[in-house]
């Protein structure tokens, strides 16, 4: 298994954090790529190197949350 590059992980984390922050301020359907990259202080090229669109970053965040929540439930209930 190949480990992801540290700069890739850092960029993706910055983009995800920016999206989460923005989602607390405005409706998710109104968040744009420009909003995310401005908040993350990264370029649009960096965004598109990792995600095809804003919906994909939202889905990734949701899927990770669900996965972690299910793991938590498994550990606490069984």
Task: Describe the residue ranges of each PLM region.
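Helix-turn-helix
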Residues: 22-55
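Primarily secretory-pathway and cell-envelope proteins
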Residues: 1, 44, 76-78
